[in-house]
Amino acid sequence: MTITKLAWRDLVPDTDSYQEIFAQPHLIDENDPLFSDTQPRLQFALEQLLHTRASSSFMLAKAPEESEYLNLIANAARTLQSDAGQLVGGHYEVSGHSIRLRHAVSADDNFATLTQVVAADWVEAEQLFGCLRQFNGDITLQPGLVHQANGGILIISLRTLLAQPLLWMRLKNIVNRERFDWVAFDESRPLPVSVPSMPLKLKVILVGERESLADFQEMEPELSEQAIYSEFEDTLQIVDAESVTQWCRWVTFTARHNHLPAPGADAWPVLIREAARYTGEQETLPLSPQWILRQCKEVASLCDGDTFSGEQLNLMLQQREWREGFLAERMQDEILQEQILIETEGERIGQINALSVIEFPGHPRAFGEPSRISCVVHIGDGEFTDIERKAELGGNIHAKGMMIMQAFLMSELQLEQQIPFSASLTFEQSYSEVDGDSASMAELCALISALADVPVNQSIAITGSVDQFGRAQPVGGLNEKIEGFFAICQQRELTGKQGVIIPTANVRHLSLHSELVKAVEEGKFTIWAVDDVTDALPLLLNLVWDGEDQTTLMQTIQERIAQASQQEGRHRFPWPLRWLNWFIPN
């Protein structure tokens, strides 16, 4: 049996050993290999693309299609360019209705450029390919992004090209032919003059999310296979002091590069706690520029200098939580006003507090709340009824969890015949679809309680899924779930007996609010970690599952089954002949 009562230090990332790193200024110069340190795969892919014998002129990069990411990739590509500043392109001379092209002799020529990297997250046809304009008989040619990137690299978001397929077809043609032809965007309105084509050589980096890449692969299967591929790594694993330093330097660089205040020495632990909540891992921190910039932008209004303190960051996070917390508070009020029935004291047979995460479309913050699961057992033919499934409110994953739970129980009891009980399980006061298996451990405990006729401690909530051997498996949304139950207990008054049971594998995901951490430190709230569902049963039902020289839950259930089977044997004649049972010896 493995039951771990977690200390308050287990509930947040450990930052005490990194105080010396936090005190450093984390200055970065232009030649700092920060990008290659944090994005080694993407850096290597860029090197391959810029090689003189590159296997393809196209590169696919999995990354959010936002300007912050495109600019990061562009800056990294610029540092790798060996021919940067080389004059390429030409000059179009317009004389009346005659246009001719000559080689560029200076950067001032209208279609000349110094080899460079150009990035755009959204473009229209004229912006990408340039255009011919005519006003009062005068003709002018305007270069597009492909001309600006001539001899260099064009970085563009995939959603632009997927939304405008003709742009992609023309861009691919230009890259493959290494030549730019002037054509009319509207076939009904041809160009008023003939414009000579020009040599144009560039490499293209297509940036997209997983869905965009999948759509592009379907549209261009051969090119997708041949293109160089890499990904922007959006998280950094914290394995030692060096990786912590690396992350601090990345955050500082992102803030300074965007003219925002960077974290001060005492702000780093607070930022790391919030970062761990974002990634869902104590030892995984985000590299997302958008996430970092959001924190720095919101706290900037609270500080005057070029750094912000831990107190200022805490205040900003509290303000954000309050600003976004109306919906969560209303849901808590429903429980506190007993419109949704959740008990946090006492005992009930076949009733348990599970934990759920609520996400509303359009709402920026997920929040947790307890869910009451009930189980009723009666004499029957061994059928387990999932009411959610029967009412078509249960998803496939939830149904799978129910079947796994039943398989564990039947295997443990080792019955030679069908169990003489039927059971029904449901999420009480749940009126929308339920899916996922994160409540399967709670459902199993409720079922065992009902079968054994032993009450469940209502002061304790539980989350986690189980496999067919009863092992507790990790689930998501852990911080929100625990904080949701804690908020209800706190509003009703903490008794010191309340707490939450979680799978041991979930401990590494904890990054809880300071108020909850303080309650655990003071012994007013408890969090237990278990490896197996049988470890949770003594906490919830005050009886062990199996053992010698003591009353156990398995023994209690088997005795009830034996009694029910004996009664069933007595009534094996049809009702009109029931009097014959009197002649059957006991």
Report the location of each language-model feature.
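Residues in well-ordered beta-strands of folded domains
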Residues: 62, 205, 353-356, 374-376, ...
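Peripheral, non-AAA+ core regions of ATP-driven protein-machinery
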Residues: 1-3, 9-11, 15-24, 44-49, ...
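A short helix-to-beta-strand connector/capping loop
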Residues: 200, 225, 521-525
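Short regulatory helix/loop adjacent to the ATP-binding pocket of P-loop NTPases
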Residues: 212-226, 513-519
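Conserved ASCE/P-loop NTPase catalytic core
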Residues: 2-217, 229-240, 249-311, 316-371, ...
